[in-house]
Amino acid sequence: MNIRRFKESDAVAVSAVVIKTLRISNVKDYPAELMEEVVKSQQPQNILERASWTHFYVVEDGDKIIGCGSIGPFWGKEDESGLFTIFVLPKYQGKGVGRLIMETLEKDEYFLRAKRIEIPSSITGCQFYRKFGYDYKNGVAELDEERLYRLEKFREI
């Protein structure tokens, strides 16, 4: 397994990883119709746009992309960052790929400069992120209007 920065040529493969994961893993926690709406926003052009303002990483097994994750400024703030688009192909879940992504994101300069890091978390990923010390924003353990949990972690910098 190897983790590296995203290249534009990865967009189609990353989109496929995200979409497959949404349709197999996330659909267990959300209606299929909602997942198909989310799929529309995870096309290669959407991935390229997100990669333009984040530090986007991919995990490879050989030459196959099996996971991804990104970190970027939270609404343009210098001292707050957000984690986005963290997905691992279902076949590779539970094998340390997600941990590798999180460890990499938490070494990135956007993480290291931030006092607060926020994750818009799916129901599917919530407990995974909580293992890394992220907790419910303002203590609110309820889904927001996007049907996501807002998780956050504070750091001393």
Task: Please identify what each model-predicted range represents.
Residues V88, G94-K107, K131:
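Conserved acetyl-CoA-binding loop-helix of GNAT-fold acetyltransferases
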Residues F128-Y129, Y134:
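Conserved hydrophobic/aromatic "anchor" residues
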Residues T21, D108, F128:
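Short alpha-helical functional segments enriched in proximate histidine and acidic residues
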Residues E60-G62, K153-E156:
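Active-site beta-strand termini and strand-to-loop segments that position acidic
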Residues E118-P120, D135-L151:
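Conserved catalytic-core motifs of GNAT/GCN5-like acyltransferases
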Residues M1-V12, F154-I157:
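Conserved N-terminal entry element of GNAT/NAT acetyltransferase domains
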Residues R5-S9, A16-P90, M102-T104, E142:
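Acetyl-CoA-dependent GNAT
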Residues M102, E109-S122:
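Conserved GNAT acetyl-CoA-binding A-motif
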